[in-house]
Structure formats: structure tokens, C-alpha cells
Amino acid sequence: RLLDQRLVDAVVLDIRHCDGNALDLPARFPRIPMYALSALRPEDGTLLASCRKAGFTGILVEGVDNAVAGEWIAARTAQVARRAALADAPRLLRLTDRLQLAAWDEVLRRVGVPTKTGHVAQALRVTREHLSREFGAGGAPNLKRVIDLARAACAADLLGNPGYTVRGVVRILGYASPSHLAGAARRVAGATPLELRELGPRGVLTRFLRGRTRSRV
């Protein structure tokens, strides 16, 4: 249920209290790391083998991995993978100034919620006008378009999961309607929402760099 309501970066399942449908989750959501939690009792052996076969990212041993599990999972989330796919975006977008880079990081941090220039400016404690002017300096895209880019890249990543529909992604990312996501996908990548599924985050960035970096249309 949570996967259908909000942006989820990783899932930990206590396999002793899950029904058989839990084993289907890695196949339905391959871009979201899934971890099985177990006390490693002898009777859990068959179930653990089933988890590995189903595609779970890892097995966490209750009482043994507790101290390091949070840090270990945090380094291997869907968000980390999305950021890695866009790691060279600042260079490709000509974002070199400290304010530009801080704004880019804030845009990525807010990628799961509707974001306007004013939200980013408030987080960085500058005026909206100053941020808009400085962000687009040196040939960089305008900030509104970059916000569209980051959110469309996130939508593309989510749509890479067979368990998500376009309407489901619209709900999770807070788009007003499927047509609003379609408009963003068209502006950023010249693609339909369904085509985002094939592009992935990196493909969206590549399309964006082909002449779609300036003002909204």
C-alpha cells in the first residue's frame, strides 16, 4: 500500500510475517531495493532461498545487522541510484557556481513533491528573483526547466517498475493530472509518459541536452 502512495527508496520486509505476495515485489519493483529481514532460524532456510531467487537485494539478520542496517541500506537506495544516473548533470548543464550547485541539490532533494522556484529559493535563503537570475547565468538552463528535468527523470525511474502505471506515478509525485506529467515529459524529453519508461533517468537527461534546456513552451 505504501508503494502506491509515496516515493519509496527501499523496502525492508520481515519475511516471517509476510504473505506469499511479498515474493512478487522485486519483480514488480526492480528499481526499488528490497531487503528481507530474518532471525536466520533453521525453519527460515527455504524462505530465504526463495527471497534470493525472487530478486531481493539482500538479507538482513535480525539482532546481528541492526547496528549497521540503516547506514548500509541508505547507501543503496533508489534515490542513490537516481543521483548516480544524473551525477554528471551539473557539468553537462553548466552548473558551476556554488548557488547553482546548491539549487540543483535542493531540486533533487525535493524531487518527490511539486516544486517551484520559490520553494528552492526559500530553502537557500535567497530571493526568487536572485536565484532565477543567478541560476541561469553562464549558459545554464533556467531553473523551472531544471525542476521539470529532475521530476521527469524521477518519473522515468518509477515507470521502470512494472508495478507502476502512469496514473500511479502521477499520484506519487504529486502531479495534478496525467496530462501535467505528459506536458513535463514533452517539454523536457520530447517524450510521452510511456516513453519515459524506456528512457530512464539517464535517457531523460540526454534528451534534455538536445535543445530543450531553455524556457518553457
Q: How should each PLM-predicted stretch be described?
A:
Residues 1-10, 17-18:
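Acidic, metal-coordinating helix/loop segments flanking the phosphotransfer/catalytic sites
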Residues 11, 31-45:
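A short, hydrophobic beta-strand element within the central beta-sheet of small alpha/beta folds
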Residues 41-58:
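Alpha4 helix (beta4-alpha4-beta5 surface) of REC/receiver domains from two-component response regulators
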Residues 46, 63-73, 130:
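C-terminal output helix
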Residues 73-89:
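The C-terminal output helix
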Residues 89-114, 123, 145-164:
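A short, Lys/Arg-enriched amphipathic alpha-helix from helix-turn-helix/homeodomain DNA-binding modules
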Residues 117-146, 170-192:
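Basic/polar phosphate-binding segments, predominantly the helix-turn-helix DNA-binding elements
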Residues 183-217:
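…primarily DNA-binding HTH/wHTH and HhH modules…
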